[in-house]
């Protein structure tokens, strides 16, 4: 007796689902999980392509699945897996279910399967090997000849018995209708195996021809009763002639002489549980749309024709029986007993592949190091970068590394020939023909690096304190665009060259309650900081970039020599500062209080409770001695940028406030209270008495 083995047929979405479960849920857990496999009767399939177990994209979501998948963590585990033991376990499960009777409540266990897999998620290669456990019968089942079959050669006899006898169109139609009706009222795991009982009706008395009566009795004057396998033990075949009793299974095999693989386990059930050694089976292969074609066949098998029929064994005896030999590992496409490999990069959209690859390294952080890391919060934070030069280039690349999907550039400069070596978003071609706009080219470069990022560039000049307005219409338009951009983003990065260019975005960010991140460079030093936000319950908030100043920002570009006009700094300072700025930003997002996270009171070498540790206020770095200092600075009540008076004036007056701040010298100092601070300092200085002595005497300050 030959059987058509199952062949695995995996849909591409399943691999994506498996990868998602591994990254987001299973992580390092390689425990076996249920997987749903389906097979169906498909008359149109060629013989070699029939008898397939289909694994759909949602196969991992079903709790009622008889398949198991063990997705291991390394390729070495996959290669060194104890496969004989795994197959033995799968066969033992079927064997035990047959003996304890649970197989009757879930017959689909007879066609259970196991998958061993390894998902190489960096290269998107999936290694897998299916096993369809089949318990051997000893002695084997062989086809038997019906008692009314005419004499013929032994070889022809075997071939015909393997093919079986087809049902007539009337019988087939009646059987399909009965099976369809029964399948509506039973669990889907019952439908693959069932009992069928033929009821023969009395022939029509009006027909006088005995041969006609006999034909009607065999075909049209018969109907079918269908029941689950469990009904065998409730007397479903009681007082029914043997030739009218059938054990049935849905057979996806289109081979005429080779029934499907699941029959092997069904025969073990029939013999081991019920002691039956001669059985009549129906290979149910019809579909409702073609129910009159009669593809279903009846086959008759015998287990031990030379022995007396055995009686069913007692439960205790059955449970003590050893498991027979189990086979079932699938052969690969070359016919060898080996696993298969599928390379998903051949089928995936490159952009989709890039999306998943970008997420992979980040999600791996959650496996061991930081399980509570909120990657979605980082991903959906919209970042506005004011400055697309050295700092802007490095900051944007680091934000991409953290999975930020929306990055907007603002810069009014063009790419010069000195830029590409220090600014990684630009190249030599960008310097030609007067130079490309930095904001636009930076946006294009990010898209070339990672097409999944949503990025735009805006060429505009940020109005600067100390720089009087030349064309109010243009400056007002730039202000309005900047205000729209700030309102549409969650975080603002101040990455410009001059101090005064950071003033207005600081005021606007504070007024809008946005996260404001700032980085500034010296020759061998830098400062990286986050601006504080207003919190009602914490009046002593953190300061901003201008809180240590006692004067308002002024024009710092006036009368500068060449070395002052260019950003003269050690080349490594910008990458270091940019990396620290982005890491500080991400740590801030992960803190339970977000932008309101307090600065650590004292230096603590241990990680805090939240995912990425402490969130300092400022980091000041010095490459002269390679030292970083975490500094905390409180807000200054008379700050020219973040004080309540300045922020309130901006909220109330908007553009009018900005126009006065740019055009009227001393307006910001007077509004913020810095002018009063200067006056009090001068008064205090005037009150100091100086005791003048001779040149040989020390000056004593009273």
UniProtKB/Swiss-Prot annotation:
Any one GO biological process: cellular response to nitrogen starvation
Predominant location: cytoplasm
Subcellular localization(s) per the UniProt record: Cytoplasm; Preautophagosomal structure
Coiled-coil regions listed in the entry: none
InterPro entries attached to this UniProt entry: Atg7, Atg7_N, Atg7_N_1, Atg7_N_2, ThiF/MoeB/HesA, ThiF_NAD_FAD-bd, Ubiquitin-activating_enz
SUPFAM superfamilies documented for this protein: Activating enzymes of the ubiquitin-like proteins
Sequence ranges of Basic and acidic residues compositional bias: 154-163
Superkingdom classification of source: Eukaryota
Biased composition (Polar residues): 208-222, 304-319
Stretches for region Disordered: 143-167, 201-222, 295-319
One cellular component term from this protein's GO annotations in UniProt: phagophore assembly site
Residues of the active site: 566 (glycyl thioester intermediate)
UniProt entry keywords in alphabetical sequence: Autophagy, Cytoplasm, Protein transport, Transport, Ubl conjugation pathway
Domain notes: The GxGxxG motif is important for the function, possibly through binding with ATP.
General function of this protein: E1-like activating enzyme involved in the 2 ubiquitin-like systems required for cytoplasm to vacuole transport (Cvt) and autophagy. Activates atg12 for its conjugation with atg5 and atg8 for its conjugation with phosphatidylethanolamine. Both systems are needed for the atg8 association to Cvt vesicles and autophagosomes membranes. Autophagy is essential for maintenance of amino acid levels and protein synthesis under nitrogen starvation.
Protein name: Ubiquitin-like modifier-activating enzyme atg7
Organism placement in taxonomy: Eukaryota, Fungi, Dikarya, Ascomycota, Pezizomycotina
